[in-house]
Amino acid sequence: MADQLIRGTAADNGIRVVGVISTNLTEEARQRHKLSYVATAALGRTMASALLISSSMKKQEARLNLRIKGDGPLGGLLVDAGPDGTVRGYVQNPGVELPPNAKGKLDVGGAVGKGFLYAVKDFGRGYPYSSTVELVSGEIGDDVTHYLATSEQTPSALLVGVFVGAEGVTAAGGILLQILPKAARDESLVAKLESRLGQLSGFTPLLQQGKSLHDIFQDLLGDEDLNIFPETQMVRFDCGCTFERMMGALKMLGQDELLDMIEKDGGAEATCNFCNEVYHADVDHLSRLVEELKADAH
């Protein structure tokens, strides 16, 4: 099934619901960064969360950054996503592997440890909005839900998951339910949604059963005046880094540093943290930058 995101409302527009399938982009991240099983799960859950949250940002150029910094062996991770359906991210220590937790699952919480979640929303105009919350469990879903409830003051239920095995990622994605102010006063509705989500064994088992996002929406909200929007948005891993951007960054180092690279290293190499793409600049490239800087100085 193609990576995609759909949206809808329910309960007379009192509930916003967003769902995403991110299997292929999570597998791409796993391959690019050579991620362990537990690192794949941590990054995949965070990428799904970021896509779900950023989908409600109005401007296409808006971006959401989710950074998780814990004291566990994973170190930390950073994800960048936008309402255009693009996402990228990386893990500080991608090779970390841990034994399964007490439930026999990948121990994402143990890999992340205790720490904080930092969120920055850049709306494409004005100043970015940033907030920080303490991690609840390190399992990502709980932590992002806590962020939404405390920083955005929106009662939310988030279910994200990644299934990764010897053949790679075979299921990944999530669903976000947000209760808007007009429905938040209906305690029975809130309790019903919490109960239904609580009965689910996770998000990836639903995909493995062959359910589509439409099916999952119907199962959860079919009796609550569900309205699924007709647009299906494609989502993908996309970094946006280019050789030209790398050259621009090198140019900022100045003439002396560039001349030193030419003399000592015979060129330069840069690796993008977000996608692990490696860019090479040879002596000719660096020499042109030096000439440009000389021309700019006159």
Swiss-Prot record:
PTM note: Under oxidizing conditions two disulfide bonds are formed involving the reactive cysteines. Under reducing conditions zinc is bound to the reactive cysteines and the protein is inactive.
InterPro entries, sorted: Heat_shock_Hsp33, Heat_shock_Hsp33_C, Heat_shock_Hsp33_N
Keyword Secreted found: no
GO BP of this protein: protein refolding
Predominant location: cytoplasm
Keywords: Chaperone, Cytoplasm, Disulfide bond, Redox-active center, Stress response, Zinc
Gene Ontology molecular function terms on file: protein folding chaperone; unfolded protein binding
Protein name: 33 kDa chaperonin
Family affiliation: Belongs to the HSP33 family.
Location(s) in or outside the cell: Cytoplasm
HAMAP family xref list: HslO
Organism: Picosynechococcus sp. (strain ATCC 27264 / PCC 7002 / PR-6)
Record's GO cellular component terms: cytoplasm
Disulfide bonds: 239-241, 272-275
A Pfam family it matches: HSP33
Domain of life: Bacteria
Function: Redox regulated molecular chaperone. Protects both thermally unfolding and oxidatively damaged proteins from irreversible aggregation. Plays an important role in the bacterial defense system toward oxidative stress.
